[in-house]
A protein has these predicted regions:
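Conserved alpha/beta-hydrolase
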Residues: 11-13, 18-48
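Active-site nucleophile loop of the alpha/beta-hydrolase fold
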Residues: 109-118
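Short glycine-enriched nucleophile-adjacent loop
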Residues: 91-102
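Serine-hydrolase catalytic core
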Residues: 142-185
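Active-site glycine-rich loops that stabilize anionic/oxyanionic intermediates
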Residues: 5-9, 88
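Alpha/beta-hydrolase active-site loop
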Residues: 51-75
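Alpha/beta-hydrolase fold nucleophile elbow
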Residues: 77-88
Length: 185
C-alpha cells in the first residue's frame, strides 16, 4: 500500500491506519510530500513557518517525487499488487499519477476527494458550514474534536490554506481531466 497524505499534514498522522494495515499483513509505504512534515522541515532548514510550501518545481516536482516513490515500492515488491490510497490533496496527486501511469497501480482508493475540474473543488473556506463563536476552524477535518486538536498540536502540520501555500498558478495545476479508458473492476 502506498499512502498519499493531504495538504498541510504528513504521513505520521496516518499511524493508526498504517498500524492496522500492517497488522493485517500489508506492507505500507508513506512519505512526507515536498514541503510537508519532516521532509518539509529538512527542505526549509527547520523553518516551521514554511511547512506546506512545495519549493522549487512546485506541483510538478511533487508529483514526480511521488512517482519516484511508486517506482521504489515496485522495485522492492515486484510481485505484489500495489494499492494507492490518496486523501484530500493526496487524492488529487493520486489522480495525476493514475492519469500518467495507470499500469502502475492495481487499485486506487480516493478519500476526501473531488473531480479535478473547476467548480468541483472547493477553494474557499472548508469550515464555513461549522462557523460559530466557539468553532476552532478545524471542524471540517473530522467529526471527532480530538482529531482536530491533535492536528492543531502537531508541530509538523500547518493550517495555512492551500491557495496561500501554493499560490494561484501552482494550485491551478490541480485541475485536470480524468484519462479516458482507465481500467476498472
Amino acid at each position: 500500500v502506498q499512502l498519499a497524505h493531504g495538504v498541510g499534514e504528513h504521513a505520521g498522522r496516518y499511524a493508526e491506519l498504517i498500524a492496522a494495515l500492517v497488522a493485517d499483513g500489508y506492507s505500507v509505504y508513506a512519505d512526507d510530500h515536498r514541503g510537508h512534515g519532516r521532509t518539509g522541515m529538512k527542505q526549509h532548514g527547520g523553518d516551521v513557518s514554511k511547512l506546506g510550501r512545495l519549493g522549487p518545481g512546485g506541483m510538478n516536482a511533487t508529483v514526480a517525487a511521488l512517482w519516484q516513490f511508486t517506482q521504489l515500492i515496485r522495485d522492492e515488491n515486484p510481485n505484489l499488487p500495489l494499492v494507492l490510497i490518496g486523501h484530500s490533496w493526496g487524492s488529487f496527486l493520486s489522480q495525476m499519477l493514475l492519469n500518467d501511469h495507470p499500469e502502475a497501480y492495481d487499485a486506487v482508493v480516493l478519500s476526501g476527494t473531488a473531480l479535478r475540474w473547476p467548480g468541483s473543488m472547493n477553494g474557499g473556506d472548508l469550515n464555513a458550514p461549522w462557523k460559530g463563536k466557539d468553532s476552532s476552524g478545524l471542524e471540517w477535518l473530522s467529526r471527532d474534536p480530538a482529531v482536530a486538536q491533535q492536528f492543531k498540536d502537531d508541530p509538523l502540520t500547518t493550517e495555512v490554506p492551500l491557495l496561500k501555500l501554493f499560490g494561484v498558478i501552482e494550485a491551478a495545476k490541480l485541475f485536470g481531466r480524468p484519462r479516458k479508458h482507465l481500467g476498472r473492476d
